[in-house]
UniProtKB/Swiss-Prot annotation:
Phosphorylation on Thr-203 destabilizes the heterotrimer of alpha, beta and gamma, and inhibits Rho activation. Belongs to the G-alpha family. G(12) subfamily. One of its GO terms (molecular function) is GTPase activity. Guanine nucleotide-binding proteins (G proteins) are involved as modulators or transducers in various transmembrane signaling systems. Activates effector molecule RhoA by binding and activating RhoGEFs (ARHGEF1/p115RhoGEF, ARHGEF11/PDZ-RhoGEF and ARHGEF12/LARG). GNA13-dependent Rho signaling subsequently regulates transcription factor AP-1 (activating protein-1). Promotes tumor cell invasion and metastasis by activating Rho/ROCK signaling pathway. Inhibits CDH1-mediated cell adhesion in a process independent from Rho activation. PROSITE patterns: G_ALPHA. This is Guanine nucleotide-binding protein subunit alpha-13. It comes from Mus musculus (Mouse). Residues 195-203 are annotated as: G2 motif. The modification Phosphothreonine is found at residue 203.
Amino acid sequence: MADFLPSRSVLSVCFPGCVLTNGEAEQQRKSKEIDKCLSREKTYVKRLVKILLLGAGESGKSTFLKQMRIIHGQDFDQRAREEFRPTIYSNVIKGMRVLVDAREKLHIPWGDNKNQLHGDKLMAFDTRAPMAAQGMVETRVFLQYLPAIRALWEDSGIQNAYDRRREFQLGESVKYFLDNLDKLGVPDYIPSQQDILLARRPTKGIHEYDFEIKNVPFKMVDVGGQRSERKRWFECFDSVTSILFLVSSSEFDQVLMEDRQTNRLTESLNIFETIVNNRVFSNVSIILFLNKTDLLEEKVQVVSIKDYFLEFEGDPHCLRDVQKFLVECFRGKRRDQQQRPLYHHFTTAINTENIRLVFRDVKDTILHDNLKQLMLQ
C-alpha cells in the first residue's frame, strides 16, 4: 500500500503557518538577511570611531586626511597621483602671480628689467578660464608659462618679495614647487607622495575617509575651514567620538585671507573657544594639534611673537617658550577647567612619520577614553 502523503492544502489547513510557498520562503529568507544586515550595521555604528577634523582654513586638515590614507589605507596609485598634477600646476602659477604682484606693490626693483615682460605674461593669465577657475591648469598650458616662471623665480626682485611674504598672502608650498620646476616641467610628470601632500586646494563641502585599525572602524571627516564653509560643520556633529582641532602654529603674525585684517591665531582661538565650550561636545575627546612645527621653528628665529601678542612672556626666539605660550592660550579658552583633559600634540602634517607616531598616541587616547561607548572591553 502506497504511503499516504497529505497535500499542501491539507497541511495548510491542519498546521497553518507551517507550510510556505516558494515565494513566501524566499521572502522570509530575504527578511532574515535584512535583519542580519541591520544587526551588523547597528554593531558597526556602536563601535565606529568618528573623528571630526576642525580648524581654520589652511591649518592642515586636508593634508592630515591625505596622511591617513597613506598610513592606514591605500596609497595614491598612479591615476590618483595624476589627478593632482593640474592642481600643482595651478598652485605654481597662482603663487608666482602673487609674487609678481607683491614685488610691484612693495616697490621692489627687478634684478633684471627684462623680466617685466615675463611678469606681464603671468599677470595676463586668464584665471576665469573653466579649468583655472576650478584651481586646475593643463600640462600644455603650464609648459607654455614655464620659461617665464623659471626666469622670474631666479630674479632677485622676486626673491626679495618672497623674503617679505608675511606681508601678503602666499601659499606655504609655493617655494617647494618653484624649487622643483625641472621635475614639474617634464611632460609626463607624475606627482610624488610629497608633492601630493603639499598640493593645496581649498576644501569645499564634506570629505570622509573610512579605515580600520585592529578591527575597529574609523571614520575621519574633513570640513572646509574657511568662514564660508563653517556653516557645514553642524552637519557633522552627530555621533562624534573625538575632535582633532588643527591650528597653524606658525601663523601668529599673519592675517586671514578672507578679510585681510583678523590675526590668524586669534581666529583659531575664537573658533576653538566656541567648540570646546559647546555642550554638545561635553563627552567628546578634544585633541589639539599645533601644526606646522617646522615652519614655526623657522619663524621664531626671525619674528617676535611678542609684537603680536603683548601678553607673551619668555624668549620670543625660543621654540619651547613659544609652544608653551600657544598651549596656554588654548587651555585658557576652556570655561570649565574641570572637564575632560585637553590633549595636545606638536605636529608637521606633511611629515608622514611624524603623523604616524602622533596618530598612534591619539588612537590610544581615543579608544581609552571611549572604551565603554565603543563596547571594546
